[in-house]
From Swiss-Prot:
The lineage of its organism: Viruses, Riboviria, Pararnavirae, Artverviricota, Revtraviricetes. A lipid is attached at residue 2 (N-myristoyl glycine). The active site is at 452 (protease). Gene3D superfamilies: 1.10.1200.30, Acid Proteases, Human Immunodeficiency Virus Type 1 Capsid Protein, Zinc finger, CCHC-type. Pfam families: Gag_p19, Gag_p24, Gag_p24_C, RVP, zf-CCHC. This is Gag-Pro polyprotein. The keyword RNA-binding does not apply. Keywords: Aspartyl protease, Capsid protein, Host-virus interaction, Hydrolase, Lipoprotein, Metal-binding, Myristate, Phosphoprotein, Protease, Repeat, Viral budding, Viral budding via the host ESCRT complexes, Viral matrix protein, Viral nucleoprotein, Viral release from host cell, Virion, Zinc, Zinc-finger. Sequence repeats lie at residues 342-362, 367-387.
Length: 571
């Protein structure tokens, strides 16, 4: 900041007294140099070391500085003594004596005359950073805040545009609005009292003080600008909206309510709040609510849709347990299970005593009452169906393979069970899929898709999407070679579920068929769902042999030809 040293005071002086000395040094003629500020700091160190006490205005007058040792420091002390003595006034001889306070309250007293003013120059970015660093921990409108800004103004003689830039750099938007309101009221009040050199016919005070030859008029505007910081309206202490974060056990509705209250208290009237609420309602939500919003494609949606998606979310609570070790007698052993109640009489199956009928060794398992509801095989119960093998492997067992961590969106056991019970037709294995996303046509929220384990990626027809969906060309390797003009990549997330209640899977990118022919559920979705396809064996396999028919019709019975289902090639 020019020739000014750091505003942080050296050891042996209070911040208010140090700011007074710096402001008094600004009135030296010629203007102070870096050596003058160095001499001033060396004088404070010398005074604190020799006098064994901090420097104050009453104890550190001009006589306390030895002449010729610290340069122009005696002139600085004399100027400060003259200004403060004229401002306070000497008490009369008949003034009643008062008991001094137990401590000297800190006070930053303004310098009435700034001396010879510097020529105007715009602040550099480095100087703005220095000013902000000095007052970042000070309250706006406090004495140290005002005195620091006054010193910065003395060195640069800023115009109203420079002061507005400084205000935007050091103050929050709320404080900027409050300061502008206070400054406008102060200018209107002073204009009514006829400012010195102000001509209403020449424009506003802001316009006239910006002229190169403004002189005292610019100084009056600067004083009003500083005075506006003192008159900032007091407001209750509210939590900034950027620090409001949803707690792990806090409902999403309460979190959004706190966010809206903070924005209403912090932002002035007329400032749009909806973009901030829409952004922070996802960014500051807890991890579980963020996963819900990601799965449903509502990351950038309005807050109303997010409230509907997370309204029924509740944290998973665990029963707390406290382990306390207390010295005392030996604790009893583990609790033994209660003995089973003996049967009241003999078993009605074998007519022997000692066991219940459900535990009778002569009990045999009869045939199932009907065919298996999964594979339609009448020879076994549902619990023994071989199609449940995949479920046992997922749960983990003696014959389970190595556990493969899914790509993302791990599913619960109940969700996996609802996926494994979807029947597939043999001729054309298809499943109903529920889709949602910003690029889908409104009518394509539910569709029938072909299950193809040979397709590496899921494919959608182009007529399911809006006209201007984000796309990039894709080269697909098929049976006939590489296709470069038929498929595109949809560059946008899409949410997919096999049942309306979920679970929901988010796919980052999908192949789009521009010929509108394929709707394929590929391995990318099947692996995310941890799905497996089980084909049961035939109950009565076909027999190859002679038929019981007339000789003219004797022949061999063959299986019907396999269905010709075009398979999407590996990519």
């Amino acid at each position: 900041m020019g020739n000014s040293p750091s505003y942080n005071p050296p050891a042996g002086i209070s911040p208010s007294d140090w700011l007074n000395l710096l402001q008094s040094a600004q009135r030296l003629n010629p203007r102070p140099s870096p050596s003058d500020f160095t001499d001033l700091k060396n004088y404070i160190h010398w005074f604190h070391k020799t006098q064994k006490k901090p420097w104050t205005f009453t104890s550190g007058g001009p006589a306390s500085c030895p002449p010729g040792k610290f340069g122009r420091v005696p002139l600085v002390l004399a100027t400060l003594n003259e200004v403060l003595s004229n401002d306070e006034g000497a008490p009369g001889a008949s003034a009643p004596e008062e008991q001094p306070p137990p401590y000297d309250p800190p006070a930053v007293l303004p310098i009435i005359s700034e001396g010879n003013r510097n020529r105007h120059r715009a602040w550099a970015l480095r100087e703005l950073q220095d000013i902000k660093k000095e007052i970042e921990n000070k309250a706006p409108g406090s004495q140290v805040w005002i005195q620091t800004l006054r010193l910065a103004i003395l060195q640069a003689d800023p115009t109203p545009a420079d002061l507005e830039q400084l205000c935007q750099y050091i103050a929050s938007p709320v404080d900027q609005t409050a300061h502008m309101t206070s400054l406008t009221a102060a200018i209107a009040a002073e204009a009514a009292n006829t400012l010195q050199g102000f001509n209403p016919k020449m424009g506003t005070l802001t316009q006239q003080s910006a002229q190169p030859n403004a002189g005292d008029l610019r100084s009056q505007y600067q004083n009003l600008w500083l005075q506006a910081w003192k008159n900032l309206p007091t407001r209750p202490s509210v939590q900034p909206w950027s620090t409001i974060v949803q707690g792990p056990a806090e409902s999403y509705v309460e979190f959004v309510n706190r966010l809206q209250i903070s924005l209403a208290d912090n932002l002035p009237d007329g400032v749009p709040k909806e973009p901030i609420i829409d952004s922070l309602s996802y960014a500051n939500a807890n991890k579980e609510c963020q996963q819900i919003l990601q799965g449903r494609g509502l990351v950038a949606a309005p807050v109303g849709q997010k409230l509907q998606a997370c309204a029924h979310w509740a944290p998973k609570t665990k029963q707390p347990a406290i382990l306390v070790h207390t010295p005392g007698p030996k604790m009893p052993g583990p609790r033994q299970p209660a003995p089973k109640r003996p049967p009241p009489g003999p078993c009605y199956r074998c007519l022997k005593e000692g066991h219940w009928a459900r535990d009778c060794p002569t009990k045999t398992t009869g045939p199932p009452p009907g065919p298996c509801p999964i594979c339609k095989d009448p020879s076994h119960w549902k619990r023994d169906c071989p199609t449940l093998k995949s479920k046992k492997l997922i749960e983990g067992g003696p014959s389970a393979p190595q556990i493969i961590t899914p790509i993302t969106d791990s599913l619960s056991e109940a969700e996996l069970e609802c996926l494994l019970s979807i029947p597939l037709a043999r001729s054309r294995p298809s499943v109903a899929v529920y889709l949602s996303g910003p690029w889908l046509q409104p009518s394509q929220n539910q569709a029938l898709m072909l299950v193809d384990t040979g397709a590496e990626n899921t494919v959608l027809p182009q007529n399911w999407l809006v006209r201007d969906y984000p796309r990039t060309p894709a080269a697909v390797l098929g049976a006939g070679g590489i296709s470069r003009n038929r498929y595109n990549w949809l560059q946008g997330p899409l949410t997919l579920a096999l049942k309306p209640e979920g679970p929901f899977i988010t796919i980052p990118k999908i192949l789009v068929d521009t010929f509108d022919k394929w709707q394929i559920l590929g391995r990318d979705v099947l692996s995310r769902l941890q799905a497996s396809i089980s084909i049961p064996e035939e109950v009565h396999p076909p027999v190859v042999g002679v038929l019981d028919a007339p000789p003219s019709h004797i022949g061999l019975e063959h299986l019907p030809p396999p269905p010709e289902v075009p398979q999407f090639p590996l990519n």
